[in-house]
Structure formats: structure tokens, C-alpha cells
Amino acid sequence: MQAKKPGGSSGGGRSGELQGDEAQRNKKKKKKVSCFSNIKIFLVSECALMLAQGTVGAYLVSVLTTLERRFNLQSADVGVIASSFEIGNLALILFVSYFGARGHRPRLIGCGGIVMALGALLSALPEFLTHQYKYEAGEIRWGAEGRDVCAANGSGGDQGPDPDLICRSRTATNMMYLLLIGAQVLLGIGATPVQPLGVSYIDDHVRRKDSSLYIGILFTMLVFGPACGFILGSFCTKIYVDAVFIDTSNLDITPDDPRWIGAWWGGFLLCGALLFFSSVLMFGFPQSLPPHSDPALESEQAMLPEREYERPKPSNGVLRHPLEPDSSASCFQQLRVIPKVTKHLLSNPVFTCIILAACMEIAVVAGFAAFLGKYLEQQFNLTTSSANQLLGMTAIPCACLGIFLGGLLVKKLSLSALGAIRMAMLVNLVSTACYVSFLFLGCDTGPVAGVTVPYGNSSTPGSALDPYSSCNKNCECQTDSFTPVCGADGITYLSACFAGCNSTNLTGCACLMTIPPENATVIPGKCPSPGCQEAFLTFLCVMCVCSMIGAMAQTPSVIILIRTVSPELKSYALGVLFLLLRLLGFIPPPLIFGAGIDSTCLFWSTFCGEQGACALYDNVAYRYLYVSIAIALKSFAFLLYTTTWQCLRKNYKRYIKNHEGGLSTSEFFASTLTLDNLGRDPVPANQTHRTKFIYNLEDHEWCENMESVL
């Protein structure tokens, strides 16, 4: 016996060494993946991807006016380009949200980011496939020094290019337009899994009380992206469009010149690189992170009525146990479920109303913001670069702050359903009041010879207005472009040619009839409007306040939405949200706003005998129509918020016997009856009904999990 002890001890030692080595290997293996097993690391990665997505989306908006001039497009045309992103997103959002919830969500998000990177690179391709921009001759005839002057004396008569050659390039321009649309569709397809799967993945792996803060941070980064996009647009439009092909030291124009075209394509290349590198990180995360605490206490399933035959399941259809019964369902059977699930969700008035309200709010952002840079250029006579820089440094950061504050208020004040919807109603009213003030903040078009006032500013009926007059009828002035000049008489002329200037130094302008010939000169640009600078500063301040307050409703709306559906339907509910946001909130508004803006045009340029881009707008009509559309959408959103509040209030009366459906003053923003404790009432008799109320706010057919929908 004594002799066996050393042997046994030695064997035990070897066994202990083996176990120690295995434990050490497991420890090293665990250490290798630990950085991707933290939900905060995923939040950072998702924020980086959403930041890049927001950047490329806003960058397109920042260069829309540049694209108009580069490819001679109308506002309705660029509206189609802006809406193409949503069309691509719309095509796959439901399928990705439904099937992606059961798949490897981080990898799907990474694949979507790579597709977006490809779309961004394709967006820059038209510049390398079309002819170089020639500002000396341009698409019109300029004088020897690059100015459009009167050719009555024969000077500059042979300076312009062959018109037939220019018109033959029209077909190539149309192809570039279609390529831009296709690239935006590809961007939309790639963005499909990023938001719904990212939000549901985060909501699954954080404590419920922290969910609003995490989602608020996520959407803050999504909105901070446009700030980066506008700043990037401001930088790129200061670089000449063909800077990589020519020696820019020989240029005699600056970004302040109306003929300047910036390097609109450069930002797309940079955004493509950012999208690619931020997407690569997503492939390191697991399908499901380790639970941070007892799932029975933190999961939303704990709030559902308990059934003995049901096993606890994580939300969004992500199964920690791979042998669940529904994993054997065929793809065709799962496709048949989608209409039933969609009908079930839309049959809930609270769910439907809050989604439609979000659509109206997003419609204001999509339509108003898409042409806000153009609006600043027209109303306040800013350059494209200055408008983009101001938007990127003022309004958008304020919107980011508003989204973050909205999520923080939901967390810190423990807002109930009624508190959250009342908060949304309040911020909607305040932001609508800001939009109303925009009706009175702007500048007039001012006198424009032959367009708003007759030449010589004589009392001629408006019907007799004509850009061509006896003073310039022999000048062979072209209308391919708009290069306004301000005359010494305080009147704006469409170009130096229309002012009758026969010299490239902008002197001897025959159409300045009220000015002595020796003083008949013009300077480049529109004539300034009195009081315009003060109106612009006020507009900028109000815009910042409006952006911050209006954005505070976004996070409460999303939180209400994901709390009104059963956990298994969360990802799909978010997919329905983003589908309707694209269908109603993102696609129609740019088209509607663009068509409305075109209707206020006073003078159209012509290109090869066809109507080109608008050269001059009626600023007053532009302002009233542009702002009124936004006010109408905000008002409709308020009605939908009110309907949601009425539905919630009715259910509070129905299910909470002692509350009477009203809220005290202290409960206006911070009701102690929160969604967190509403389903955990200690009274067993009411627990089922109150829990049912959380997910079935309008007493429709109750759905506890996916199997009951089948």
C-alpha cells in the first residue's frame, strides 16, 4: 500500500497537469474572444457603422446642387436620386428583418456594410466616365477671359465649343444619371440589416432599464453622421471637380464663382473606405453574447404570462438552444407566416399610429433636410460650401444632442407609456412652432431684369417681362447656365451678357439705362437684399433649437414600439417600422418637396433645346411652399400622437382600476407606473391582464410567441 502511494500521487499529478493545461488553453481561448463578447464593444462597432452610413447619406444631400449643375438636372431629378436609396432598402427590409432575426445578426450587418461600401464607390464612378468640365467655354459661350459677355461686336464669336458636340454628350450624361440611381439603390440594399438587426441585438443583451440609453446613443451616432457628411461636403466642394486631371494652379475661378463645380465624387470614395473598415469588425461577434445576469430576471419573457409547457426563449428568434422545434420549419412555411405576423402587428392601433407618426416626423427630415442646403443658397445667397459647413456644424449636432437627451430622459425619469407619448406630443408642438417662424425668416428674390422687373425698371405689365430686350437682343446671350451679376442700378441681371456688357471687365453695360454710360458696370453675384443677414442669423438659431427639440421624440417612440410587441416579434416589428419609414417617410418627401420647389421657378435654363435646371426662384413662394409642407407633416404627426395617447389612456382606464386613466402633474413626464413595473404587480389575479396590456395595448388577439401566430 505504501508503494502505491507515490505512483498514485504521480498519476494524480499528471492528471492535474493535464487539467491545468486544458484549463489554461480554455482560458487563453476565452481571452481571445473576450473583446467581442462585450455588448459595449458591439455598441461601439455598430455606432461606427451607423456613423459611416449617416455620413454617406448626408454627403449625397450636400452635393445635390453640385450634381444639378454638373449633369444639368432638375430638382425633381435629384429628388429621384435621393429616393433611390430608400427603394433599395424597401425591397429587402421585411425579409432581412424576419429571417435575419433567426440568423447570425452581426455577420449579416457586416455583409450589409460591405454592400454599402460598394454602392458608395459606384456613386463616384460617373465623374471618371464622363467628359471633363470646361468652365472656360462651359456648356455656354464665354468671352476670352471666361465671362459671358455680349457678342454683338463679334468678340468671342468663335470662342464657344461646337453646340452639336455638347448635345451629343447628352446621352452620356443620362447614363451617368442612371448610374447614380443604381449606386444609391445598392446603398439602400446594404443598409437593410444595419438598423433593425443592430437595435434588436443590443436590446437583447442589455438590461431593460438601460435599453433606452443604448438605443439613444445608437441613433445619436446615426444622426451625427450627417454632420460629418455635410462637413465633408463643404471640404470636397472647395476642391475643383477635375483636380486630379488638370493643374489647378492655372484656374482663374474660385469656389465663390457661380461656374465653380466642386469635387463631389471625393467624399463617396472616402465614405466607401469608412464603410468597409467599420463592417469588418462585425464578423468577430458571436450570434449571441453570454448572458450578463439571470435571463429570467432581465428578459422581457419574464413579463409574459407563465405557461408550464413553455420553455424560456430569448427574444427575436435567436435560439441559445439549437434544437428548438421550430428550427425544422421550411423556408416556404416561414414565408407563409410573414403576412400573418404583419397583419397581427398592424391590427394594434398603438403600434400602427406610433409608426405612422414616426413616418411623418421622418418625412419632414427627409424632405426638408434634403433641400435645406439648396434653400440656404437661394434664400440667403450662400455658396454651396458655406451652406454645407453651417449645416454640419450647427443644426445636425443639435439634433444629435436632442436624440441623446430623449433617450436619457426615458431612462432617468422612468417614463411610462403615457409619459413617453406626452413627451413626443410636447416636443412636436414646440418644433412645429419653430417651423411656423420660418415662414417669416427669409429674403426676397429682389429685382431681376426681365424676370421680376422690366429692363429700365419702367412700369410695364408683368406679362411683358422678357429676359431679352432691345439692349441685348443682338448679343446672342445663352441660357444654358445662370451667372448673375449685380448692376450699379441695384438690379440683378441673369448674366453680363443680358446686362449688355461688351467687355470682360464688366463695363459698358448697355442695359443699365438709368445709369450714366461711364458708370454702367456690374459685379459678379446677386444684389444683396436689405436685412437678409439678420434674418439668416435668426433662422440659424431657431433651426438649432428646432433640431434639438424635434429629435427628442425619436428614442421614446422606438421604445414604445418595441415594448408593444412580444419579444419574438421585436426584430420583425422593427423591420416593419423601417419598411414604412422608407415607404412613407423617405421616398415620397424628396419627390414632393422637389416638385414643389420646381413649381416656384421663375426662369429655367435650357440645354440643347430642352428645359434644364432652374436658374432663378421666387424666394417668397419657395419659402412659403417649402415650409408649409413641413408644417402640414408635423401637424399630421401630432394628430397621430394624440390618437396613440387616447388609445393608451383608454387602456389605462380599462386595466388599472384605481387609476382612472389620468396622470398627476408629477406623472406627466415621470409616472411611477412604468412599463418595467406594470407587468410585475404583486397581485396574482391581475398579473396576467396587466402583462397582456403591455404587449396588447388594444385588447386584440393575444400573441405570446411565434407559434401562436402560426
From Swiss-Prot:
This is Solute carrier organic anion transporter family member 3A1. Belongs to the organo anion transporter (TC 2.A.60) family. It is found in: Basolateral cell membrane; Apical cell membrane; Basal cell membrane. Disulfide bonds join 471-501, 477-497, 486-511. Its main location: membrane. Residues 1-40, 101-106, 204-222, 287-344, 411-414, 563-571, 649-705 are cytoplasmic. One of its GO terms (molecular function) is organic anion transmembrane transporter activity. InterPro entries: Kazal_dom, Kazal_dom_sf, MFS_trans_sf, OATP. It catalyses: L-thyroxine(out) = L-thyroxine(in); prostaglandin E1(out) = prostaglandin E1(in); prostaglandin E2(out) = prostaglandin E2(in); prostaglandin F2alpha(out) = prostaglandin F2alpha(in). NCBIfam families: oat. Residues 1-25 are annotated as: Disordered. It comes from Bos taurus. The modification N-acetylmethionine is found at residue 1. Residues 61-79, 132-174, 244-261, 367-386, 439-539, 598-630 are extracellular. Putative organic anion antiporter with apparent broad substrate specificity. Recognizes various substrates including thyroid hormone L-thyroxine, prostanoids such as prostaglandin E1 and E2, bile acids such as taurocholate, glycolate and glycochenodeoxycholate and peptide hormones such as L-arginine vasopressin, likely operating in a tissue-specific manner. The transport mechanism, its electrogenicity and potential tissue-specific counterions remain to be elucidated. Glycans are attached at residues 153, 381, 457, 502, 505, 519. CDD domains: MFS_SLCO3_OATP3 (cd17402). The chain crosses the membrane at residues 41-60, 80-100, 107-131, 175-203, 223-243, 262-286, 345-366, 387-410, 415-438, 540-562, 572-597, 631-648. It is a multi-pass membrane protein.
